[in-house]
Every structure is written in structure tokens, then in C-alpha cells.
């Protein structure tokens, strides 16, 4: 084994969506960073759907951007259809989604990585960690090179012992066309980490020239398209539509006829699949009364005929795939360019991580992405930027960045993972966040820009832009509170026409906006200053005013829980010796080893009474250490 003659501060293993954000974060913070990947031509490759964002996932992308990450800027530069989802619902659950030109997305991210100072890209398969006792010191590659590093971030995706299934045929692979990673997960087991098995899948890729789009429902994007990044002024890529197709009873009969050759139902696949993204055979079996299922036919790019049938993932044999796709209206002559497949892979139970995403068993080793049991590019990227930041902070000897549940969806996700663990692929939903009215897409920069600037990921220009926006929001709120309607003839006629004749002279614009039937657009009809206010400021101000009571209530809940969240628990706490805790609670606390009292309170089975006992024991523990 040859030892490379350079010691890195941070080594990132894997160049998917988690690895790219981790490597960029560390390098931008001034760390000498190495990004290792099995295939340099597959950096940031969209292995499944060619899209970014969606319900709750869009929130994650906005948060990554606010922290100084790259995903939002990358999709803004390569997106070919943008939509805001849930526009008829409240602001807490509105979400951005964009179709990507799959190849342009990959190529742009690779170019960003290549042009980043302090970042080295190398192709190589990591087969083992190089450890000194319980401290990681570097990585070993199949080509016989040992790279030394102060910290290591593992972002292995679906590659650890990856096994691809198409019907009863199966073969090793990290994804179609790429080799798996063999040996690394076995070593992680030997190091004391609990390794499990999960499964995911992807649909076939269809030849768009063989689809009759005139018989499908077109779905157009928003006009004008709204960017993800707070730094993007406008979208310049050509925009294209998607289309909607449906299965039918004949499709379902074909699928049922192939279940005996489905690895999912033949008992061949051991791993647990994603609950919220089931395969088409799973949908047909679980919902026998449903006479059709929707499929979104999504283009994979502007310069390709490949189409992605979203909602149609499967591991059925290829003859069944061809038959059921061709049973759908508009797809009768469709040709499959790449078959659908399922894939099993190893993951490491995230309950074994600190809030910083550092493993508890191995010092200086961080995990991010699907290795932690999550699904989705956005979930991976959110973990990646946090792991990269914390690996960099470790090399500086600084305290880790901990994002709380009350300030970000990334914080909710990490807390869920390290507190509850997961036995199935985890995906983010707005319902997982108890403070979701505070964690909106539109205010991600107001929540996280300061943090990104403090750690060194947000540029001076971006930070100044954030400060200008923040000050404009505050100034506009003050103006609306101070400006009152005079009930001029124009105002009186407008309010009467809107069915509001009871308005009194002297009512402030702020009081006016609190009414559910009045929007900021109404102010534009008679207030010239409002017409000059930027739309992003108008949006923030209107939400803050209309939901002020609910927002204040959630802020009060956060203040009440702050003491628990800010009380750390010692790593050497002997929970088994604490009198007053049940055996069940002692076992759960010993297994999870929570970082704070707040985290302990969210472990299933740990009651408020147990938290009180734990708080008393913590004070006694602190007193004993002082005397010692």
C-alpha cells in the first residue's frame, strides 16, 4: 500500500449529492479537501428522478442555499421546468420543484467542483478506512493508495454491497452501469457499527419518439419560473412541459401476472423499501380497488429523447415491464431504453451518530446521505453540507454546527435520524416539523444566512444582499403599522366594492392586511409605495402580519423548550446507575446516548417524569465531577 505524500484536512468518499455539498463546504471553509469517487463521470448524477425539490424537499434545498451550498444554484442553471406546489394551501407547505436537464446538472456540478480552490478530485474506490484505534486517519483504495486525512466523510449512496434486481436476475452494482463498493461495510461492522440493508428502485427510461404525447395530459411549468436560490435573479433555460399518463385494469392484470417473478414478492430482496415511494407492483397489490395510477412522463433533458415515467419504479422482469408500459394509453408502441430495476444496499443505522453527524464509535468519521438510511437527493445534500461544515470545524478545533428542530428542516431530519434511527428509507415531510409555520421556504435565508456567513460559506456580496432584504422587510412592517387609511373617495369606493364598508378611518395598513380577505395586491390599488416594494419583501411582510398570532405562539413554545435543548448530556453518563428510571428507559438512553436533554425527551418511551429524573441526576453528576 502506497501512502500518498499529502495529508488532507477532509476526505469525502462519494461524489453524489451529499458528497458534493460536503466537499464544497469543507473546501470553501479553507480546508485541504479530497473528493474520491468510483467514477468521475458520474459526479452529482441523478440516479433516479431528473428533478430537484418537491414537498418539504424544496424547503431543504432553500436551506442548503441559505447556508451557502450549491444545489439551488445548480438547478437554477440547468432546470427545464419550475413549479410552485401547494399554492392553494398555506405558506408553510408551499414547495418549489424543478425538472433538471440531467446531463447539464451533472456537468455543471463537476465544473464547480473542479474550479473550487482547496479541492482535489480523484477517481478511486475506497475499500477500507485507515484507523488508529477508534480514530480515523485516512482511507485505503482498491488501486493501492492510502490517503491520509484528519477527518473523513462517508457518502456512499447505494454503493455499499449494492445488488441490482431485474425480475429473478440479479447482479452486483452501485447503480446501473457502475461497480459496487465491496469491503467497506464489512469493515464498518468490524469497527462496531450496526449495518443494515435497505432497498430502493427506479423506473425504466422510455424513448420519447415512441410515445404519442397528443393522447397524454400536458403539464406546464410556472410562467415566469421562480428560482430556488436567493442569489438567482431569473431563470434563463428554455422551459418544456411534462405529461401525465395513467395505468389501467389491463396494466394491473399484467403486473399481477408477473408477481411470481418479482424479487420483492418472491422473497429474494431482503432490504426494506421506501414507504412513500412504492414500486408500481406494490401499489397494485396494496390498493387493489384503485382502477388507475398516475405517471408523470418527464423529459431527462433538452438534448435527449429519454423520458422518465415518475411513479412507475419496478423490479419486475423485462418482459412484464414492456407489456405493462405498452398497456398505457399513448404508450402502446413505447420502447424501453433502460430497464427499471430495484437495488439493495448497506446502510449504517444513524442512531449511532452525534448531532454533528460524527459517528460515536469512530472519532473524526462523519456519515451523510443514504448511508444514514435516507432517500432523496435533497435529504442527502442537507446532511452533506452539515457533515462537511462539521468536519472542517473539527480540523480547526472549533465546536460543531448544530442545527435545531426550531430553525431548519435539516435540523428536524438530523434529529429524527439520530434519535429514532430508521429501518426504512427516510424522506422528509412538512408534517415531521412541529414548528413548520416558522420553517417556510420563503424565510430560509432569514433563518440560516447568518450561520452560513459565520462559518465562511456565504460571500460578502450575498450577505450584504441578505441584510438589505432583512432591513427592507423591517422598514416595510414599520411603514404599514404607521400608515393609516384616510378613507378618501378612492379608498372608500374600493373597500365598498370589496364588501368592506365597515372599515374606519385611521385603520392601519397592518390591521388591514390581518383581514383574511385583504392581500398585499389590494394595497397596490391605492398605495403607491407598496407598488415599489420588491415582491420577495411583500411576500415576507404579508405572511408575518397575517400569521403573527400563530408565529408568536410557536416562538413561545421554542422559548419554553430551550432549556432542555441547551442542556448537554455527558458522553460518559451511566444511565443504568440512575435510580428512578425504568429498565426500559435506561436501555433506550444507553442505546441512543442522546447529546442533550431535549433529544432524550424525544426518544419513544422516555416520559416527562423520566426527563425530570434525568435532569436531577445530571446535576448530581456535574457535582460529583467538580468534587473529583
Curated annotation (Swiss-Prot):
<dbReference type="InterPro" id="IPR049312">
    <property type="entry name" value="GIDA_C_N"/>
</dbReference>
<comment type="subunit">
    <text>Homodimer. Heterotetramer of two MnmE and two MnmG subunits.</text>
</comment>
<keyword id="KW-0274">FAD</keyword>
<feature type="binding site">
    <location>
        <begin position="14"/>
        <end position="19"/>
    </location>
    <ligand>
        <name>FAD</name>
    </ligand>
</feature>
<dbReference type="InterPro" id="IPR047001">
    <property type="entry name" value="MnmG_C_subdom"/>
</dbReference>
<comment type="function">
    <text>NAD-binding protein involved in the addition of a carboxymethylaminomethyl (cmnm) group at the wobble position (U34) of certain tRNAs, forming tRNA-cmnm(5)s(2)U34.</text>
</comment>
<dbReference type="InterPro" id="IPR004416">
    <property type="entry name" value="MnmG"/>
</dbReference>
<dbReference type="GO" id="GO:0050660">
    <property type="term" value="F:flavin adenine dinucleotide binding"/>
</dbReference>
<dbReference type="InterPro" id="IPR020595">
    <property type="entry name" value="MnmG-rel_CS"/>
</dbReference>
<dbReference type="GO" id="GO:0002098">
    <property type="term" value="P:tRNA wobble uridine modification"/>
</dbReference>
<dbReference type="GO" id="GO:0005829">
    <property type="term" value="C:cytosol"/>
</dbReference>
<dbReference type="InterPro" id="IPR002218">
    <property type="entry name" value="MnmG-rel"/>
</dbReference>
<keyword id="KW-0963">Cytoplasm</keyword>
<dbReference type="InterPro" id="IPR044920">
    <property type="entry name" value="MnmG_C_subdom_sf"/>
</dbReference>
<dbReference type="Pfam" id="PF01134">
    <property type="entry name" value="GIDA"/>
</dbReference>
<dbReference type="InterPro" id="IPR026904">
    <property type="entry name" value="MnmG_C"/>
</dbReference>
<feature type="binding site">
    <location>
        <position position="126"/>
    </location>
    <ligand>
        <name>FAD</name>
    </ligand>
</feature>
<keyword id="KW-0285">Flavoprotein</keyword>
<dbReference type="Pfam" id="PF21680">
    <property type="entry name" value="GIDA_C_1st"/>
</dbReference>
<protein>
    <recommendedName>
        <fullName>tRNA uridine 5-carboxymethylaminomethyl modification enzyme MnmG</fullName>
    </recommendedName>
</protein>
<comment type="similarity">
    <text>Belongs to the MnmG family.</text>
</comment>
<feature type="binding site">
    <location>
        <position position="181"/>
    </location>
    <ligand>
        <name>FAD</name>
    </ligand>
</feature>
<dbReference type="GO" id="GO:0030488">
    <property type="term" value="P:tRNA methylation"/>
</dbReference>
<dbReference type="Pfam" id="PF13932">
    <property type="entry name" value="SAM_GIDA_C"/>
</dbReference>
<keyword id="KW-0819">tRNA processing</keyword>
<feature type="binding site">
    <location>
        <position position="370"/>
    </location>
    <ligand>
        <name>FAD</name>
    </ligand>
</feature>
<dbReference type="InterPro" id="IPR040131">
    <property type="entry name" value="MnmG_N"/>
</dbReference>
<dbReference type="InterPro" id="IPR036188">
    <property type="entry name" value="FAD/NAD-bd_sf"/>
</dbReference>
<keyword id="KW-0520">NAD</keyword>
<feature type="binding site">
    <location>
        <begin position="273"/>
        <end position="287"/>
    </location>
    <ligand>
        <name>NAD(+)</name>
    </ligand>
</feature>
Amino acid at each position: 500500500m502506497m501512502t500518498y505524500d499529502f495529508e488532507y484536512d477532509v476526505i469525502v468518499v462519494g461524489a453524489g449529492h451529499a458528497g458534493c455539498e460536503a466537499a464544497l463546504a469543507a473546501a470553501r471553509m479553507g480546508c485541504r479537501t479530497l473528493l474520491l469517487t468510483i467514477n468521475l463521470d458520474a459526479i452529482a448524477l441523478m440516479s433516479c428522478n431528473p428533478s430537484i425539490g418537491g414537498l418539504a424537499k424544496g424547503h431543504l434545498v432553500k436551506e442548503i442555499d441559505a447556508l451557502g451550498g450549491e444545489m439551488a444554484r445548480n438547478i437554477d442553471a440547468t432546470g427545464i421546468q419550475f413549479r410552485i406546489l401547494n399554492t392553494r394551501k398555506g405558506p408553510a407547505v408551499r414547495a418549489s420543484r424543478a425538472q433538471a436537464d440531467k446531463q447539464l446538472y451533472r456537468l455543471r456540478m463537476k465544473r464547480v467542483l473542479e474550479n473550487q480552490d482547496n479541492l482535489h478530485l480523484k477517481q478511486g474506490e475506497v475499500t477500507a478506512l485507515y484507523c488508529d484505534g477508534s480514530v480515523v486517519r485516512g482511507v485505503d483504495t482498491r488501486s493501492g493508495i492510502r490517503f491520509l486525512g484528519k477527518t473523513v466523510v462517508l457518502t456512499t449512496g447505494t454503493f455499499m454491497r449494492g445488488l441490482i434486481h431485474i425480475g429473478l436476475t440479479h447482479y452486483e452494482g452501485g447503480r446501473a452501469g457502475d461497480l459496487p463498493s465491496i469491503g467497506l461495510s464489512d469493515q464498518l461492522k468490524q469497527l462496531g457499527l450496526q449495518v443494515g440493508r435497505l432497498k430502493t428502485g427506479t423506473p425504466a427510461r422510455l424513448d420519447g419518439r415512441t410515445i404519442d404525447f397528443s393522447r397524454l395530459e400536458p403539464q406546464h411549468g410556472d410562467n415566469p419560473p421562480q428560482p430556488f436560490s436567493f442569489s438567482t435573479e431569473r431563470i434563463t433555460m428554455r422551459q418544456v412541459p411534462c405529461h401525465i399518463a395513467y395505468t389501467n385494469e389491463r396494466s394491473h392484470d399484467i403486473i399481477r401476472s408477473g408477481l411470481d417473478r418479482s424479487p420483492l414478492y418472491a422473497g429474494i430482496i431482503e432490504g426494506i423499501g421506501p414507504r412513500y415511494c412504492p414500486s408500481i407492483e406494490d401499489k397494485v397489490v396494496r390498493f387493489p380497488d384503485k382502477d388507475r395510477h398516475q405517471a408523470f412522463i418527464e423529459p431527462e433533458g433538452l438534448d435527449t429523447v429519454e423520458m422518465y415515467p415518475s411513479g412507475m419504479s419496478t423490479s419486475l422482469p423485462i418482459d412484464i415491464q414492456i407489456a405493462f408500459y405498452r398497456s398505457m394509453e399513448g404508450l402502446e408502441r413505447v420502447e424501453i431504453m433502460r430497464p427499471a430495476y430495484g437495488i439493495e444496499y448497506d446502510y449504517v443505522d444513524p442512531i449511532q451518530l452525534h448531532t454533528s453527524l460524527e459517528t460515536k464509535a469512530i472519532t473524526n468519521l462523519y456519515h451523510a446521505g443514504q448511508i444514514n438510511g435516507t432517500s432523496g437527493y435533497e435529504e442527502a445534500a442537507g446532511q452533506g453540507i452539515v457533515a462537511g461544515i462539521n468536519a472542517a470545524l473539527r480540523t480547526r478545533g472549533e465546536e460543531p454546527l448544530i442545527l435545531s428542530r426550531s430553525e431548519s428542516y435539516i435540523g428536524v431530519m438530523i434529529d429524527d435520524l439520530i434519535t429514532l434511527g430508521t429501518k426504512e428509507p427516510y424522506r422528509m415531510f412538512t408534517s415531521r416539523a412541529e414548528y413548520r409555520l416558522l420553517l417556510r421556504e420563503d424565510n430560509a435565508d432569514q433563518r440560516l444566512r447568518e450561520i452560513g456567513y459565520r462559518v465562511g460559506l456565504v460571500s460578502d456580496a450575498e450577505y450584504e444582499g441578505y441584510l438589505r432584504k432583512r432591513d427592507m422587510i423591517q422598514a416595510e412592517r414599520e411603514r404599514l403599522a404607521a400608515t393609516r387609511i384616510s378613507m378618501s373617495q378612492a379608498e372608500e369606493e374600493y373597500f365598498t366594492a370589496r364588501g368592506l364598508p365597515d372599515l374606519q378611518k385611521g385603520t392601519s395598513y397592518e390591521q388591514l392586511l390581518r383581514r383574511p380577505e385583504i392581500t398585499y395586491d389590494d394595497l397596490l390599488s391605492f398605495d403607491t409605495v407598496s407598488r415599489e416594494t420588491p415582491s420577495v419583501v411583500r411576500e415576507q411582510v404579508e405572511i408575518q402580519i397575517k400569521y403573527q398570532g400563530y408565529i408568536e405562539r410557536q416562538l413561545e413554545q421554542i422559548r419554553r423548550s430551550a432549556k432542555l435543548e441547551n442542556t448537554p448530556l455527558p458522553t460518559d453518563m451511566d444511565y443504568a446507575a440512575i435510580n428512578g428510571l425504568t429498565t426500559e428507559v435506561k436501555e433506550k438512553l444507553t442505546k441512543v446516548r442522546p447529546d442533550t436533554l431535549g433529544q432524550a425527551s424525544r426518544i419513544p418511551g422516555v416520559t416527562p417524569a423520566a426527563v425530570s429524573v434525568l435532569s436531577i441526576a445530571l446535576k448530581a453528576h456535574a457535582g460529583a465531577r467538580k468534587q473529583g
